[in-house]
Amino acid sequence: MGSRILVINPGSTSTKVAIFNEGKISFDAEVSHPRERIDKFSTVMEQKEFRSAAVMDLIKDELAKGTPDMVVGRGGLLKPIPGGPYSINDAMISDLESGRYGVHPCNLGAILAREFAEFWEVPSMIMDPVVTDEMDPVAKVTGLPEIKRRSVFHALSQRGVARSVAAEMGLEYEQAKFIVGHMGGGVSIGAHRYGKVVDVINALDGEGPFSPERSGTLPILPVLNLVESGQYTFDEMRKVVTSRSGVLGLLGTNDMREVQARMEEGDDEARLVLEALVYNASKYICSFIPALMKDDPQKRPIDAIILTGGVARSKLLVKAVEDVVGFIAPVKVVTGLEEMEVMGRGGLAVLRGEMQPQEYHSD
């Protein structure tokens, strides 16, 4: 079997694809989807044909060079499972389509991967889905008995950049301590302690700092008042806090380049929002110091704070965060297609028999 691998990664406002040949990226592309176009769909699943057409448009010229031997999709919101590769099966597709464990465009990753793989009659898989769960039990406890915190984060991105930085620093990932912040349309932060992600900021459930599109942590009673007053239904509120708030709600745009330009032109409101974004991100990064010091008798220092994701491309924002949290550990920035590379490497390892894909079973 060859090792030509197609990787599909649907995000909140973009779709990325990459083609790997013998473990190296031979082609990668990304298409941005304007918010007004995405908002025409009432559900994520309604975007399937739109996203499928976007993928085909990106790769159509590459298909003349040969069809893939495997398709790897971004993992979606499934039940909590260990990390690693998983074959895409009916149980997985059912849970993703129904939104049983949550609704997000990443749910389309496995669905699109399987669709293309079945057309070419090749295997399909996901790698390190966002529901990878290695949280310490103590980190899941809340003050409300009916609610436990969930491990939902950018597992693929965070593990990929953490391993990359560990290698750069001459460390084994399993021997290092990192705080990793993925800053995209949503922000997730993870405490990586000796190879396990023992606590996370779960942006999907509304935790953590606000981001370009999400509200982040909110005082709960005012939120309940908004719903009780009839200003929002439950479904409307869920959509607002997960995709129509944050910088978008405050300034009317989720494009951080536009916000930065407005600030540089003297827009005081844009300046305040950017300063608040940096303050909130820094505050939650610092909140993970206990997670990395807990159960470590040597109290070994944190090796690095790692920033990744689209927002990490802004030198101004990265410098502002570094000025606040740099006293804890060196700040490393990793941008680019790390998620795509991690998925491609995972697919290659499976094709070569170096890793065995696990089977997903629905509860």
UniProtKB/Swiss-Prot annotation:
GO BP annotations of the record are:
acetate metabolic process
Q: Name the enzyme's class.
A: transferase
Q: Which NCBIfam families match?
A: butyr_kinase (TIGR02707), PRK03011.1-5 (NF002834)
Q: Which HAMAP family match?
A: Butyrate_kinase
What protein does this entry describe?
Probable butyrate kinase
Q: What is its EC number?
A: 2.7.2.7
Swiss-Prot/TrEMBL catalytic activity: butanoate + ATP = butanoyl phosphate + ADP
First and last residue of the signal peptide: none
Q: What's a Pfam family this protein contains?
A: Acetate_kinase
As for subcellular location, the record says:
Cytoplasm
Name one cellular component (GO) term: cytoplasm
PROSITE patterns named among the record's database cross-references: ACETATE_KINASE_1 (PS01075), ACETATE_KINASE_2 (PS01076)
What keywords are annotated for this sequence in UniProt?
A: ATP-binding, Cytoplasm, Kinase, Nucleotide-binding, Transferase
What organism is listed for this UniProt entry? Maridesulfovibrio salexigens (strain ATCC 14822 / DSM 2638 / NCIMB 8403 / VKM B-1763)
The chain's disulfide connectivity reads: none
UniProt lists the family membership as follows: Belongs to the acetokinase family.
State one molecular function term (GO): ATP binding
Task: Answer yes or no on keyword Protein transport.
Answer: no
